[in-house]
Amino acid sequence: MQDSHAWSGRFSEPVSELVKHYTASIGFDYRLAEVDIEGSLAHAAMLNRSGVLSDADLEAIRRGMADILDEIRAGKLEWSVDLEDVHMNIERRLTDRIGDAGKRLHTGRSRNDQVATDIRLWLRGEIDATVHLLAGLQSSLLELAERHADTVMPGFTHLQVAQPVTFGHHLLAYVEMLARDAERMLDCRKRVNRLPLGAAALAGTTYPIDRHYTAQLLGFDDVCHNSLDAVSDRDFAIEFTAAASLAMLHLSRLSEELILWMSPRVGFIDIADRFCTGSSIMPQKKNPDVPELVRGKSGRVVGHLIALITLMKAQPLAYNKDNQEDKEPLFDTVDTLQTTLRIYADMMRGVTVKPEAMRAAVLQGYATATDLADYLVKKGLPFRDSHEVVALAVRHAEGLGVDLADLPLAKLREFSALIEDDVFGVLTPEGSLAQRDHVGGTAPAQVRAQIARHRGRLG
């Protein structure tokens, strides 16, 4: 039986069945089918414009590709392992439909520059979709932050109560992180959006091609200017996966906090039932499975980043078969991040906040101690001295089991004669918040201003 591979003429025996399945990529690169067709149509148009492909052949290719695209979208195209990959499957189907015109499509092109183009086309679209999803999650967080711009909660360092903040301010920290994630994605897109097609196998082609015309047809900003680099590097995929890893790390941090806040010992929030599961043995359990799984999946995406870096670290120029291993980590990174963003945007809308529990935690942690120290500094006491005075006052209040604001003025004055009755304006959580009325501060007015700024940015 004649070997079905496009390169079989060089070999004296067919490839073994085990090797055939080991080296085939059609099991996963079929996802590139639509962009592969898009790239092929642009390549054909360029060949026609350059006089390499006749008008009749171009029209036949366009008709054939349209039919194949319909088959793919209807799930009717049968992918063959014998044909190795998505490129050869589509080319064989095209040739079966239109004859010799299909065989001419690959003129001036190699699978090396073809696959590099496909991945860039596909990833460009996925970056745009990811940026949109990041904006959706930011909007969900902004809605929740606006409802709780005045809701007092403890800010933490070392997981110990530190100073009062608002829940809205806390959520805006994650909006800032996600905004940077989107910026990284868009910056990465600039380097993704360069055309490898025309580099051929590694050295370019002898045909009179017009790479800039192909780039224009496909919406690329520029061409890759070195043929060796164009076909061999996957740094753009690594860069995207690094940006995706950071986004997942940010979501993992938020997940950790949601898990803590939902625990009965903290009780700051509740997550809607549709995002939780129960226990097969403990009837009372309501488990925050989504945040826990997001926390776990962040490691999955970081693992893909390490896999891609390791894949590229020792490859000589130019293309090597190693690069076939770039797709599954990249595909799964996109799938994991996008699914997580979709779920998270919905989940954050279903978060129930418990302001009383948050405020009680502030009062239990001497969160206004720094405010008392600042108060004394403004009265003329050096900060290191005020720090010592307040530490003694906290120790005394802690011994009584009361908050600083509950100590009588006379007792407070025993620690410093500079303390007067206006001190109680800074010892309440609300008083503490009100004093931090500057850009980036946690005063409710500043929280609302930042929400407005972010909404203006998102449009």
Swiss-Prot record:
Q: What is its EC number?
A: 4.3.2.1
Cellular component per GO? cytosol
NCBIfam families for this protein: argH
Sorted alphabetically, which keywords does the UniProt record give?
Amino-acid biosynthesis, Arginine biosynthesis, Cytoplasm, Lyase
Q: Which residue ranges does UniProt annotate as crossing the membrane?
A: none
Enzyme class label: lyase
Query: Pfam families attached here?
Result: ASL_C2 (PF14698), Lyase_1 (PF00206)
Its UniProt entry gives the catalysed reaction(s) as:
2-(N(omega)-L-arginino)succinate = fumarate + L-arginine
The record's section on InterPro entries has:
Arg_succ_lyase_C (IPR029419), Argininosuccinate_lyase (IPR009049), Fumarase/histidase_N (IPR024083), Fumarate_lyase_CS (IPR020557), Fumarate_lyase_fam (IPR000362), Fumarate_lyase_N (IPR022761), L-Aspartase-like (IPR008948)
Q: In which pathway does it act?
A: Amino-acid biosynthesis; L-arginine biosynthesis; L-arginine from L-ornithine and carbamoyl phosphate: step 3/3
Subcellular localization: Cytoplasm
Q: Single GO molecular-function term? A: argininosuccinate lyase activity
> Protein name, please?
Argininosuccinate lyase
Concerning its family, UniProt says:
Belongs to the lyase 1 family. Argininosuccinate lyase subfamily.
Superkingdom field? Bacteria
Example GO biological process:
arginine biosynthetic process via ornithine
